[in-house]
Every structure is written in C-alpha cells, then in structure tokens.
Amino acid sequence: MTPRPGIEPAPLPSVVVLISGRGSNLRAIVESTPPCRIAAVISNRPDAGGLAFAHANGIATEVVDHTAYADAADPRGAFDAALMQAIDRHQPQLVVLAGFMRILTAGFVDHYTGRMINIHPSLLPAYPGLHTHRRALEDGVRLHGCTVHFVTSTLDNGPIVVQAAVAVDADDSEDTLSARVLEQEHRLYPQAVRWFAEGRLRIDGARVRVLPPPDADTVAAANDRALVAPALDR
Ligand code: GRF
C-alpha cells in the first residue's frame, strides 16, 4: 500500500539529562513516560548511580569526567566545551540538570538559553547553593521546598517554572526534611519536562507562563454536555 502523505507523526522532542549522582529525579522523569525522547544521560562522575538506571532502561549513557580536565589551562572552560560537544551530538531541544553538581561557565549557559532547566532543593530565591536543608533548619523557617527553573549564568537563579513548599516540623532532621522535599521534586520535575515537551512554557522576563493544554476548552465543553462518572481526564 502506498503510504498516505501527511500522516507521519511529529518526532518527539529530544532531551539530554545531566547527572552527578544517584539519579532519583532522572528515574522519576523516565518513569513518568513524558512525551519526549531521552536521547542520552551524561554524567561528570563515572560512578554516578543514575548511569546504571539509564543503561538498564536502554538509554545511551556517557561520562565526561571533569577530573580529566584538571591540568588544562582553563579547566572549567575545557570541561564545559567537552560537555557541550557531548550534548550537542544529540541535538536536544531540552537539557535537564538532574542533580548535576557543577558550576557552569557563562558561555555554556548562554548556549542553552531558554532550553536548559534545573531542579534545586529550596524555595528559590532562598538558599541558592549547597546544604539547603541544613540552612533552612538552622534558620528555623516553617516552609521549605523545591524549585524547577530555567538556568541562567547566576547560580540557582533564572525564571521559575514550578515550586512546591512543605511544612518544616519542629523535630525535623536534615534527613527527614530532605526526604519530604525529594518526594515533591519527583512530582515537579516530570511535570515541568512534560510542559516543556508539549511546548507550553513561555518565558516572559523573570516569569514563566504555563499555557493551558491545547484541548482544555474542548474537554471543558465536552464535560458540560454530559454527566460522566467517574470524571474523565481528557
Ligand atoms: C536533588 O535534591 C536535586 O534537587 C539536587 O540534587 C539532588 C539530586 O538527587 N540538585 P538525584 O540525583 O536526582 O537523586
């Protein structure tokens, strides 16, 4: 049968995920089956636990070891250049930093403006940097949480896509608080990747607008025309 023109499905947007460690956010994203193709998982550490998960799930993995560039004239620049090459071989629409523990050069960040996101374990702009849970406990804050944001050249800064806040309990330890925040990270990051893949994020200065799904009106109108129990999602 001659294939009919015009019915090829659009290719899924491609995503590269950068990790340094256990990769629980990577796992949450993969298991959410987002409408994108995870083209590769790249780690700066050969022993990152998330690499085994990616490999077991048939995702290409690569290591760009930052220690290999320690003797370069500009170690940070040389590492970022190698990382950029490794990423760009996959021509991703989106770069996802999922526990990627490296400070990136401005040139690297600029190259991915509007198409690189990060998850940070605090309610930004509070507590950029490391040890966020410990610092929140030391300050006695009652609300703590996590943030998904577009990456800019200022550390843990950039237009915020989504945040979740959790209450801090009087007897919380760093471990109990980080576990509750991580649970929220695993809800937020897959959703943010899905929004991006669906083309629903618009950066407007410091703010991000999340556009409604294209069929939102149709679903609402269909719901108005009938009583359906239990309610349909779409
Ligand atoms: C997460 O808490 C993330 O917010 C932070 O690093 C941690 C990474 O955890 N940037 P995992 O590797 O995704 O399990």
PLM feature segments, named:
Residues 1-234:
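One-carbon transfer enzymes
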